[in-house]
Amino acid sequence: MNERTQRERDRSTGGYPPREALADAWDEHSRYVGFAAGLFAIGILIGIALMAAGYNLLEIIEEMVGEPLFPDIGGQSRTELARFLLVNNTRAFLLSILGALTLGLLTAWAMVFNGIIVGNLGAFIASNDGIGFILVGLLPHGIFELPALFIAAGVGFRLLYRVGQRLRGSRDAILTKRYFYRTGLLVLVGWLLLVVAAVVEAFVTPALLEALFAA
């Protein structure tokens, strides 16, 4: 009996262990998570292209709104920085899910826009400090933060698709207890990745940059 068949049998007999529910949630959402990652990648390419054309988006946005896109966090302790990063990223995480209420437009825009900013900023920093600096500065926390945001966006896109299925009559209900359960577990895993990302960005990334690139 393969793993999927075993999960189906467990569900039919009333059992739904968290591990199996999480596996089902990933099976259900993985395509949409991949779609979100693809939108982000497109944004990165756009951001790099804009920097290559001479457009520094951080400077442009700062001139438009009259203040920096990113607040000054230099005076914060590591713990305060981790808390700030977690709160800020949790907002983006929740907005990516709730973007389903905008027919997915907000979710899609968040993925593309964040990709553009990362690509543009990364290209700028790499041109000044080298590709090694940007890799050390982004990868340690990015390997946790980006999958978390992609999961949130994937949940938003999948929810929108379920609404479409209900409208077409191919699904009896948009939301069910099992859907809430398994998707809630996936969302929890995604948020926990944000917690790890915030800690790494606040404590590990600065130490690595100082150790490897301090003058």
Regions from the language model: what does each represent?
Residues 154-215:
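Terminal transmembrane helical module of multi-pass membrane proteins
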